[in-house]
Amino acid sequence: GGKGQIEEFLRAFNGEGIQHIALICDDLMACWDRLQQLGVPFMTAPPPAYYAMLDERLPGHGEDAEALRMRGILLDGSTEAGDARLLLQIFAQPQIGPVFFEFIQRKGDEGFG
């Protein structure tokens, strides 16, 4: 199997350092729209199959899958017992050497995505 992102970072940059900076947003779609207007480049979006499988993976998530797909926003969390605990996230391309920004919106999920 492949190495995880932390192992890859350590190898590529010869040791420890800051990989990314996470910023929380109240409305990630509006945040993405504004950042896009400002010319912030984002990492490549997942394939369409990722969004096609959201309803199966997180039934009853209540998010607009097409709006997420158009922006490349990732959706994670759980919807067990009808209680949607979600994390929306997107990553900008590296801006400061290897450091990149992560933009997240938490809707009850406190995990890492």
Predicted region positions:
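Glyoxalase I/VOC metalloenzyme domain signal
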Residues: G1-G113
